[in-house]
Amino acid sequence: MKIEELIIDGFKSYAVRTVISNWDDQFNAITGLNGSGKSNILDAICFVLGITNMSTVRAQNLQDLIYKRGQAGITRASVTIVFNNRDPASSPIGFENHPQVSVTRQIIMGGTSKYLINGHRALQQNVQNLFQSVQLNINNPNFLIMQGRITKVLNMKATEILSMIEEASGTRMFEERKEKAFRTMQRKEAKVEEINTLLREEIEPRLTKLRTEKKTFLEYQHIYNDLERLSHLCTAYDYYKLSLKVEELTVQASQKHSHIAEMESSLQTSKQEVLILKEKIKKIEDERMRQMSVSSDRTLDSQLQTVNENITRISTSIELKNTALEEEHGDLQQIRGKAKELETLLRGKRKRLDEVLSVYEKRKDEHQSISKDFKSQEELISSLTTGLSTTEGHETGYSRKLHEARDTLNDFKAEKETNRLKLEGLNKQISLTKPKKAEATKRCDQLNREIDILQNHVEKLKMSLKNTNSDITGEDVLQQKLKQLAKDRGNLLNELDALKSKLAYMEFTYTDPTPNFDRSKVKGLVAQLLTLNEENYDKQTALEITAGGRLYNLIVETEKIGAQLLQKGNLKRRVTIIPLNKITSFVASAERVGAAKKISNNKAQLALELIGYDDELLPAMQYVFGSTLVCDTPESAKKVTFHPSVKLKSVTLDGDVYDPSGTLTGGSVNKSAGPLLQIQKLNSLQLKLQVVTSEYEKLETQLKDLKTQNANFHRLEQEIQLKQHELTLLIEQRETDSSFRLLSDYQQYKDDVKDLKQRLPELDRLILQSDQAIKKIERDMQEWKHNKGSKMAELEKEFNQYKHKLDEFTPILEKSENDYNGVKLECEQLEGELQNHQQSLVQGESTTSLIKTEIAELELSLVNEEHNRKKLTELIEIESAKFSGLNKEIDSLSTSMKTFESEINNGELTIQKLNHEFDRLEREKSVAITAINHLEKENDWIDGQKQHFGKQGTIFDFHSQNMRQCREQLHNLKPRFASMRKAINPKVMDMIDGVEKKEAKLRSMIKTIHRDKKKIQDTVKSIDRFKRSALEKTWREVNSSFGEIFDELLPGNSAELQPPENKEFTDGLEIHVKIGSIWKDSLAELSGGQRSLVALALIMSLLKYKPAPMYILDEIDAALDLSHTQNIGRLIKTKFKGSQFIIVSLKEGMFTNANRLFHVRFMDGSSVVQAR
């Protein structure tokens, strides 16, 4: 393949399109003056061949190849070579059927280069492959001999000459491939080392960690399964036990309900018995009253009965209240214990909440920092890629980042300067304040001591106030009661005074006859000492007629007392005295009285039986009333009086007197109230007055005590208020005191200085950090300007790292947030439970206080009622002493009735306790049912499995398992599970699979690399063997041609290539020259022309060994004289007929041997070529 035509347009000195045609296929010469552009023709050929070393064509860059660097209006350079390709044996691969091959290369201002093959666009590599296939490798050109090449050959070392032989033999290509193979081996070794490093430093540690995590994860799964199994088992056991408890409680509640029904039935029977006994007692009492000879006030019995009923009712109420109080105390104790337990749990949960919150806030800050870095990196990449900011109105890319960093740095510097100025001002203030501090401290200490003393005094007063009882409402109630009692007492006194004035004639007064006289031995008038029941009021006239004047006799204990009164008692009126120890009387026998009752059909009674009196007064009463009958009608009086079996004096209700002697006394009788009735009324009023006075005195004492307590309470309150006011004034005085303000300001200055000093190092660190960030951004900006691709890759790598870090940290933050919310919810639930218990505690304490108040009021009422019962009992005992038989029967019945009433009370208490027990069972049942519902709600699986709970042969066979051990295992597993749950990696199974695959892949790559390395090593050995053989062959042929050509150029002389002494030819070759018969030791012994001929001979011998289709020689004869130049021209013409030579020369001896001569001239600023 040889040049037929060369077309140059705009290339170097060829401004216009220049066509150089008719090239000789063997020997072409180019000549012209210096600077005419002849060498530019060779440069144009090299340009098309694809030269990359611009220095070879004497240019720095492609723009230098355009005519006048494009400044003359020509902006494009184009060179086309048309090759003769008619010889298929020397045709490029793929172009055997093309008789001509045209190759064009064009460049345009700006550096764009374009290749055309036969008019079609082609890649540079395709063009290079085309030329290399015909031994025209322009980047390692053995066909190109430019100016200076001869000098370069002369200065070559042995190894460099060997390289020329290698190039000629073609083994250089093998060497290059060998070097390439070695480089490939080195890369593979580096890759192996990289893989080993990756395996050693990343994969294996990560695999070790993941295998540990996998083991932990598998253990975690095992624990989770055990925990779930044990949790289900314990939950099922709790559910099973609760279900059994509900059934048991249902049975117990049913039994309690039945027991209550039985007790109520029994209680009803006892109440019926009480009613029967009351009816019997009433009949006996009626009979007793009927038998009484004298009427008495029945109000005492009714009052006593009322008082007894009140006492029974109050006692029962107190017992019930005490029972309720005990139960309330028990409930309060349980509530306090539960509240204390909840407080302990809540403290632990709050501590746990603080810990979880701290972790959550720390991770939240870390997440925000990572998110901020991620968004910043995303914004940076987006703005650098698109030139637009995602934040409207802001700068883009590094400019925005740099602006923000500088703003941050300025903010820190401004803060530092501000803090420095503040610190100076504060230090100045401290210096001014410090001298006054001692006096101010003394003043403040004095005020603080006074405040402490006053505060302690207030606390003591509050403690005293707390221990002082106060009842303002009770005082008001007592005052109202006293007011009413005073009113009742006044009314009773008025009635008594009025009645006493009417009975003034019955008033008996005397003076003590002797010193220390015992007035209790003077009993009183007969009329004053007897009592008359209300049912016998209609018999008061008959009794007055019966007593007659004796009604106003004075009863004394002995006749001596009577004598003393008569002698020294200063009696105001005449009086008959009845001494109890001396009086004798006639008393009707029981037989005569019985006969009288029988004859009169119970319309006659002994007068003595109708009245009431003390037992000690019996002789006197017998003396007055013991021998007279009181009859309801005159007929009955007449019958009994004159009946032989009776023969007793009788008095009718109208006052008629029948005497057995035969006399009859009667007539008009005053129907108004007689003295007996008035005396009975007087006695009743006196008794009422006594009860009211006793109650009044008792309440007055209570009121006095209560007033004292309330006064103490009010005094303490007022004193506390006064002292509290003094304390407030003293505290205000301290707050407003200049000394206090000075110390407060001084301490504030110190605290501010401390904070500022702590902040300044932090600001220095932040300023340094910001400054480093700014420098880094500036470096990044410079790197971005010079290498956008690699910088963008680095930014994207950092972005992916941030994204990966954010993706990894987000679940961690979510877990921390879930932990925090969970613990917070538990705290809120505990707080709610604690608040409910505290409310229950307050309500319970209020109920307890109310019950205590009610019990105190009931006990007070009980004391009052017992006092009333005592008074009434004393009066009734006096009244009913003489009815001991009936009384005994009544007592017996009353005892039986009290027994039944006690049974009733006990029964009611038992029923109440049973009701409480029933309510407790119902509450426990409700709690158990609630717990069951809660378990069912929290555990959906229960509904489908509960039929198997407790069944033998199932997983819920509780009898075959130790549930205590199961609970202990569950208790031990929970903290371990909780701790492992925080430590395990849930993605470890997927991760370890990926890492193991990666490890296998990398180890497979290592095996592949080692296998490839072995192949390369085998190939290199084979290449070395082939290279040595080919190199030796080439050396010997070139050596032979070298000697022959040198002999032609310089007849009679010889030259050869030999290895250095004691070395092989593969270590290098040296030029040895023989001038005449003498071998020169060095080329330095030769003349300049001889050395040039030696170099030319070597070059020509190399060209002859493996001829290329074309050779380009640029003024290789510059250092030779004319004869030697002619020899070279002749040598080329005769010895190198198969190749096309293109030679630039200025010597006629050279180009006269050429078959085609091209003459180059420089005209009008451009080169012109003429063929000759």
Curated annotation (Swiss-Prot):
GO cellular component, as recorded: chromatin; chromosome, centromeric core domain; condensed chromosome; condensin complex; cytoplasm; euchromatin; kinetochore; nucleolus
Protein name: Structural maintenance of chromosomes protein 2
Family assignment from sequence similarity: Belongs to the SMC family. SMC2 subfamily.
Residue ranges the record marks as coiled coil: 172-204, 258-507, 676-941
GO terms for MF: ATP binding; ATP hydrolysis activity; chromatin binding; DNA translocase activity
Domain notes: The flexible SMC hinge domain, which separates the large intramolecular coiled coil regions, allows the heterodimerization with cut3, forming a V-shaped heterodimer.
Keywords, comma-separated and alphabetical: ATP-binding, Cell cycle, Cell division, Chromosome, Coiled coil, Cytoplasm, DNA condensation, Mitosis, Nucleotide-binding, Nucleus
Binding positions for ATP per the UniProt entry: 32-39
